[in-house]
């Protein structure tokens, strides 16, 4: 569905997890905003007030003409890779499907509370909305603080795990209640594990030899 991005990164884009040599058309779309914040909205999904569809069409035609200039210099295919990226972007701003999918305020307040009123909880809820609308892949950054080289146990107990447990449990339950659990695979993991040995600062260091992965549904 070209009215929706195939790959969304929540809540913000990262320095990694992008398309690299595959080209810009495979990069994730990101709202670059916390869905738990007041007045959350995704920028540039609506046309400016002074730009109607006819004017947008003329701009698109002009851009297409300019893009044809010296295509022979595009040896790496960078410009060609942007073509589908632009086409999908135009489809998104001329169709209200993406606007509705990203409008988390359409959710009942009880549902929002069940996920947790924080960036992780609301990102998980927004991910469910996006998948339900037709987005095929959503990646969520669980926030900072997980690199617990110091004070590991207190950080996990008081801050990190309560938000994580609530958000992931609510997502899995919500998918099940909506009959989506057999079609949607939830995967939760970090890039490596933590050392079995506790260091002098009550922390656990990097341990690439073993890690845990949670799978649900799908």
Regions found by a protein language model. Give the residues of each.
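Ligand-binding pockets and gating/stacking loops
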Residues: 1-218
């Amino acid at each position: 569905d070209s009215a929706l991005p195939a790959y969304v990164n929540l809540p913000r884009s990262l320095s990694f997890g992008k398309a690299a040599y595959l080209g810009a058309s495979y990069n994730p779309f990101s709202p670059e905003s916390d869905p738990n914040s007041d007045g959350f909205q995704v920028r540039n999904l609506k046309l400016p007030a002074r730009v109607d569809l006819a004017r947008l069409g003329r701009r698109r035609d002009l851009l297409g003409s300019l893009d044809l200039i010296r295509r022979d210099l595009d040896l790496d295919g960078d410009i060609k890779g942007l073509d589908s990226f632009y086409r999908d972007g135009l489809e998104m701003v001329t169709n209200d499907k993406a606007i509705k999918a990203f409008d988390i305020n359409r959710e009942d307040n009880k549902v929002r509370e069940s996920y947790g009123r924080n960036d992780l909880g609301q990102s998980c809820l927004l991910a469910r909305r996006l998948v339900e609308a037709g987005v095929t892949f959503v990646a969520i950054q669980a926030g900072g603080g997980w690199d617990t080289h110091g004070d590991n146990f207190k950080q996990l107990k008081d801050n990190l795990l309560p938000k994580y447990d609530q958000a992931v449990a609510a997502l899995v339950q919500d998918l099940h209640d909506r009959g989506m659990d057999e079609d949607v695979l939830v995967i939760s993991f970090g890039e490596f594990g933590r050392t079995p040995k506790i260091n002098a600062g009550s922390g656990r260091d990097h341990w690439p030899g073993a890690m845990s992965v949670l799978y649900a549904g799908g």
